Amino acid sequence: MTLSRTALIVAWLHCFVSVSLAQDAVAPRARGEVSAAPIAAHRTGDFDAILSVRSPESGTRRWGERFQFAGDLERWDYDLAAESFGLYVPPAYDPEGEPYGVVVWVSPVDDGGIPAELRPVFDQRRLIWIGPNNAGNQRHLYPRAGLALDAALNVDRFYSIDPDRIFISGLSGGGRMSAMQAVAYPDVFAGGFSIIGVTTYLSILVGPGSGQLVPQFPTPPPDLLKRSKQQPFVVMTGSGDFNREECQLTAAAYERDGFTDLHLLDIDGMGHEMPSAEHFARGLDLLLGPPD
């Protein structure tokens, strides 16, 4: 039986969670018991918070339309008040000073907070980190995607933010999610940084020796895709990463399709793991572009 392109896309969307979970990942950061409070404007430091407003784009109807998803999303919908997010806002942040950039992080595990070694990287680049908790690979892709959109909206409401410096990044299964979001939402995210996991709307080999070429999510509308192709997109893998070939092939496919600011970082000695602070900073700097 030969499946149509649409049927293959829908099948992939339904199995996204199990594929991501099977490929997995890293341990969460050590942080003990943390209680989340409602987000407060301009709070600095490393903390968990509850956000207040759903993004219009994270509703089931709007999200389903954007991704041409024919299934029932209602059973996967979520209550934002029951969710929490890890944030890191550098201590030098000043609401009266220069606006900060944002990295929305999609984790493969249930802790969305920043690893301690990355704090100086964010301090130096005037960036805020925000990542949903309880949004690892075991969770359906719809709430994972929706929570990232909610994160982008709320951090912009409560902080002084440069809208041209709101990015999305993720690791392993979260890297796949970040690629999908960066390409499908160039009106929300100014670029994407996918680490040891990436996905595409283009047709690539689904597995070694399969001989089958399939897209992994629907092609975005032409106006959005045109904008995505002009934004920075960074893919990071390593010599010991079991997703290395897929990352290489996917990055090459994006470049062939006209992504003009595509960067593949292939780190010698890096496995399927969180990169060092030095290598993470390299990816961020490609995302941010040269200083003004």
What are the functions of these language-model segments?
Residues 164-226:
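Primarily recognizes the serine-hydrolase "nucleophile elbow" in alpha/beta-hydrolase
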Residues 91-98, 140-173, 183-188:
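Gly/Ser-rich "nucleophile elbow"/oxyanion-hole loop immediately N-terminal to the catalytic nucleophile
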Residues 97-109:
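Short beta-strand element of the alpha/beta-hydrolase
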Residues 113-130:
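Short amphipathic alpha-helix adjacent to the substrate-entry channel of hydrolases
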Residues 23-100, 252, 262, 292:
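A domain-start/cap signature at the N-terminus of enzymes
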Residues 200-282:
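The feature captures the conserved acid-bearing segment of alpha/beta-hydrolase catalytic domains
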Residues 279-292:
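Catalytic active-site module of serine/aspartate enzymes centered on a nucleophile-bearing elbow/loop
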Residues 7-18:
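Bacterial N-terminal signal peptides
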